[in-house]
């Protein structure tokens, strides 16, 4: 990818720098927001300038690291005044409260919760601020490096599993897949979760095409030939972000509206064989919280006999909550639903309209009566009955003969 969601300069372990891509401005504007404090981390997560469960956990953790290093190196800074730095126990008390505040930015995403629990454990066992800084730095680096490695594993696990299933079913042709929201490089440390599987499927398809063209392999076999990303209202992560990643990677794709899924399945010239979605939280029985619209996609896939897969690392699995009924679903500001935010386009020639600094102008356009009541949940819960498999870095988990997932080995 030409864009990184998170830029983490770790060349000086005791003086790191962090900036995150403002994803609200994509695909037309590239702007990075510096992260110096926990307040900065809270702000970019809450405003959805950064999104995607893995990326949220990484940015949240990095914001703790940058704040700790800021108060250590600059004890007279504004944020340092929140702490009693001469007393380590008092400092730990304030930090714990700050971590709770950070968690409130996105309570549905279990990755952030898990990371902050781990940071609290590190804090508890640290003898002073310097020791905490060093241990926290090591933890954050490991979190980022493992996320990227696990994304690659998930991609390959999911691609291999789907190809094997299609071959067992006797399918030997080109197929298409569906996806919702954004689960790629912009939602993670790189490569992606659900979009990572799609990337691996595309690599597999290119390899098979090369073999066939060279005459090394004339046997027909299943290969992914097209992707249908959903626009993903109301924040349009599919049209703004996933479409951008697919275009950049030159993966054949066609953007569709959230309301056209069923008709696209019925009329697609290439048979749609699977849907891959990410997850913000998977509970013990496999029920999954993900971007609003995921449930309707799962229901439609069930109706048409299309395989529906959730792709997420182990860190997204909540080993305490039993069912999706107990997941707290965040509701967004109703006003976000009444407007569309985008880049201003010249209606005559389709070019971007720029400001005096040469940057594209963004604006909001009202699309609903201001007086109308709005329900705007950020997520929905897909019951495990509608999920055919959960793809992790450990492999693909399917349901037993009783129709239940057994995720205990991941806990």
UniProtKB/Swiss-Prot annotation:
Q: What keywords is this UniProt entry annotated with?
A: Acetylation, Amino-acid biosynthesis, Cytoplasm, Isomerase, Methionine biosynthesis, Nucleus, Phosphoprotein
The function of this protein is: Catalyzes the interconversion of methylthioribose-1-phosphate (MTR-1-P) into methylthioribulose-1-phosphate (MTRu-1-P).
Q: Name one Pfam family in it.
A: IF-2B
Q: In which pathway does it act?
A: Amino-acid biosynthesis; L-methionine biosynthesis via salvage pathway; L-methionine from S-methyl-5-thio-alpha-D-ribose 1-phosphate: step 1/6
Ranked from the top, the taxonomy reads: Eukaryota, Fungi, Dikarya, Ascomycota, Saccharomycotina
Q: What class of enzyme is it?
A: isomerase
Catalyses:
5-(methylsulfanyl)-alpha-D-ribose 1-phosphate = 5-(methylsulfanyl)-D-ribulose 1-phosphate
Q: What is its EC number?
A: 5.3.1.23
Q: What is this protein called?
A: Methylthioribose-1-phosphate isomerase
Q: Enumerate the InterPro entries for this protein.
A: IF-2B-related (IPR000649), IF-M1Pi (IPR005251), IF_2B-like_C (IPR042529), Initiation_fac_2B_a/b/d (IPR011559), M1Pi_N (IPR027363), NagB/RpiA_transferase-like (IPR037171)
Recorded hits in Gene3D superfamilies, A to Z, give: translation initiation factor eif-2b, domain 1 (1.20.120.420), Translation initiation factor eif-2b, domain 2 (3.40.50.10470)
Which of the residues bear the PTM Phosphoserine?
351
Where is it localised? Answer: Cytoplasm; Nucleus
**Binding partners and assembly:** Homodimer.
Q: What is its main location?
A: cytoplasm
Question: Residue positions of the PTM N-acetylserine?
Answer: 2
């Amino acid at each position: 990818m030409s864009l990184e969601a998170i830029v983490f300069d770790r060349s000086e372990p005791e003086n790191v720098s962090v900036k995150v891509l403002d994803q609200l401005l994509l695909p037309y504007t590239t702007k990075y927001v510096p992260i110096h404090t926990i307040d900065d981390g809270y702000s970019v997560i809450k405003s959805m300038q950064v999104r995607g469960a893995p990326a949220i956990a990484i940015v949240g953790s990095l914001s703790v690291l940058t704040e700790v290093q800021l108060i250590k190196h600059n004890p007279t800074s504004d944020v340092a005044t929140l702490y009693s730095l001469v007393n380590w126990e008092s400092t730990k008390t304030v930090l714990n409260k700050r971590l709770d505040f950070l968690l409130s930015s996105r309570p549905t995403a279990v990755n952030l919760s898990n990371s902050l629990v781990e940071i609290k454990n590190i804090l508890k066992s640290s003898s002073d601020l310097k020791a905490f800084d060093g241990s926290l730095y090591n933890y954050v680096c490991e979190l980022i490096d493992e996320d990227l490695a696990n994304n690659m594993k998930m991609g390959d696990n999911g691609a291999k599993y789907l190809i094997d299933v299609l071959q067992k079913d006797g399918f030997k042709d080109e197929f298409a897949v569906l996806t919702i929201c954004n689960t790629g490089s912009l939602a993670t440390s790189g490569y992606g979760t659900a979009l990572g599987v799609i990337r691996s499927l595309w690599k597999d398809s290119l390899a098979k095409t090369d073999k066939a063209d060279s005459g090394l392999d004339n046997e027909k076999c299943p290969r992914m030939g097209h992707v249908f990303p959903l626009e993903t209202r109301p924040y349009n992560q599919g049209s703004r972000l996933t479409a951008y990643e697919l275009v950049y990677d030159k993966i054949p794709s066609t953007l569709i509206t959230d309301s056209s899924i069923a008709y696209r399945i019925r009329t697609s010239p290439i048979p749609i064989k699977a849907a891959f979605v990410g997850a913000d939280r998977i509970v013990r029985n496999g029920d999954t919280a993900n971007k609003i619209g995921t449930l309707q996609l799962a229901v439609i896939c069930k109706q048409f006999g299309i395989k529906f897969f959730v792709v997420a690392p182990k860190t997204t699995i909540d080993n305490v909550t039993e069912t999706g009924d107990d997941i707290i679903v965040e509701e967004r500001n109703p006003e976000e639903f009444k407007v569309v935010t985008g880049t201003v386009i010249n209606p005559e020639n389709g070019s971007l309209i720029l400001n005096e600094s040469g940057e594209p102008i963004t604006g909001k356009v009202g699309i609903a009566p201001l007086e109308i009541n709005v329900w705007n949940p950020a997520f929905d819960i897909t019951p495990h009955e509608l999920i055919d498999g959960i793809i992790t870095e450990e492999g693909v988990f399917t349901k037993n003969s009783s129709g239940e997932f057994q995720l205990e080995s991941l806990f």
